[in-house]
Amino acid sequence: MNDGSDFDATATSSAAQRQVRVQLTSKQEDIALPDNAGPILVPTSLRRYALSTLVNNLLGNDKPIPFEFLINGTFLRTSIDEYLTANGISAETTLEIEYVRALIPPLHIASFQHDDWVSSTDVLSATSPAATWASATISQGQEKILSGSYDGLLRVWNMSSQIVATSPAAADGGHTASIKAAKFVTPNQIASAGLDRTVRLWKYSESDEGFSGTIAPQLELYGHKSGINSLAVHAPSNRILSASSDNSVGFWSTKKSDAPAAPEDLLPSAASRSSKRRKLNSSVTVPQRGPLALLSSHTAPVSAAIFDEKDSTVGYSASWDHSLRTWDLVTSTLVDTRTTSHSLLSLEHLPELSLLAAGTSARHITLIDPRASATTISAMTLRGHTNAVVSLARDPHSTYGLISGSHDGTCRIWDIRATKTDKDGVVGESVYSISRKSLEEQGKSDTKRVGGEGVKVFSVCWDKTVGIVSAGEDKRIQINRGEGVLSA
């Protein structure tokens, strides 16, 4: 069905076609029908498009709004009749159907070119955690993008794709190897980590006009014995979590005065530096500290560590050893272990749903309930990627939304209410797939890349103001945002 005419025609015909009484509701006040709008009789042949036309007619919208429809918390992907049959529901029942705005297609906004692979990205905006924690005001148009690269440098970009600031080289207090993770802690502080085994804190400052700035070394944190794969920050408690290939989770303070001394055996040895390096470093003195704790329980590299969104004294970690572990950060003790069937490569918390999303080496995302009362390990599986899922971020607009970045060269948007049932149980399907703009520009958008060769996505961030920001092997930051369909 491709328009609403079927509804009109059928509604006026004799009762030759099955009908069902539906109650249309919405939790979004600006699109809700009046409270006194009772159930209406509609043909069971209606699908999403015709239902959307019906709701727009009932609302009296001059400009139609695309809607999605949910029955019992699941998106309607068939006709009403097929849904009733599949779920054993009588057409005599009054069916409650919730409608929501359809997701806006994420269009390409901009790409920022780098000299090397881009491993990590973060956003500073009025709605980003760093600004929210600090109660800072970021004016529209003054948002910043942070990137961490395999060339060992941090860069801060403005929305006009100009570099505002670059971190110093290794000789001047910068990273001595590739950066794997970078986050804004506050609007004036950045945390980064990478293959040089250090977590580093930086003071970020801008000129008054905002077109230039500096990233100055502030604190070096030593404790890991192998590369660091990811970071999580929590500015209100001045805490950082790091995930390392040495099988441990690092727990750190962002404040020099709170942190213990750095382990002597892990500090850069003066003997290992060339005379030229010593000379260059002589003007750069950066305080060095150690971890508050190293959480050791995993038996393989730790890929991700995050804070519980509702309780920063709780941490979660995911590892190549197939396990998800829950930590009490006050006592530095292991609380719970959930073992899955595959290596876990990324992690995100969906707090309102009491779920953790974990990206796997087996190309899917598993949703895990970490609560002790949970009877099953995996609550749902999200399938669609064709290579490892290495980055995850929540949808800032929706409790049910998630985005994933994969080595297959795509980012996929998920709404966990968009499901189907197959031999593996309830399986989620992606709502949109975002490809790399670099392929399109090369005229190779239809070219099948084995495993995402050349365009692997390494990091994705979803900001309410800026949009979806992803980074990857194509040496680019890419920004996509839902524009051009709805103004609201």
UniProtKB/Swiss-Prot annotation:
InterPro entries: G-protein_beta_WD-40_rep, NLE, WD40/YVTN_repeat-like_dom_sf, WD40_repeat_CS, WD40_repeat_dom_sf, WD40_rpt, WDR12/Ytm1. One of its GO terms (cellular component) is nucleoplasm. One of its GO terms (molecular function) is ribonucleoprotein complex binding. Keywords: Nucleus, Repeat, Ribosome biogenesis, rRNA processing, WD repeat. PROSITE patterns: WD_REPEATS_1, WD_REPEATS_2, WD_REPEATS_REGION. The keyword Repeat applies. Residues 20-101 are annotated as: Ubiquitin-like (UBL) domain. It comes from the Eukaryota. GO terms for biological process: chromosome organization; maturation of 5.8S rRNA from tricistronic rRNA transcript (SSU-rRNA, 5.8S rRNA, LSU-rRNA); maturation of LSU-rRNA from tricistronic rRNA transcript (SSU-rRNA, 5.8S rRNA, LSU-rRNA); protein-RNA complex remodeling. It is found in: Nucleus, Nucleolus; Nucleus, Nucleoplasm. Its main location: nucleus. SUPFAM superfamilies: WD40 repeat-like. Residues 256-285 are annotated as: Disordered. WD repeats lie at residues 128-167, 174-212, 223-262, 297-337, 339-378, 384-424, 452-488. Pfam families: NLE (PF08154), WD40 (PF00400). Component of the NOP7 complex, which is required for maturation of the 25S and 5.8S ribosomal RNAs and formation of the 60S ribosome. Belongs to the WD repeat WDR12/YTM1 family. Component of the NOP7 complex, composed of erb1, nop7 and ytm1. The complex is held together by erb1, which interacts with nop7 via its N-terminal domain and with ytm1 via a high-affinity interaction between the seven-bladed beta-propeller domains of the 2 proteins. The NOP7 complex associates with the 66S pre-ribosome. Interacts (via UBL domain) with mdn1 (via VWFA/MIDAS domain). This is Ribosome biogenesis protein ytm1. It comes from Neosartorya fischeri (strain ATCC 1020 / DSM 3700 / CBS 544.65 / FGSC A1164 / JCM 1740 / NRRL 181 / WB 181). The gene is ytm1.
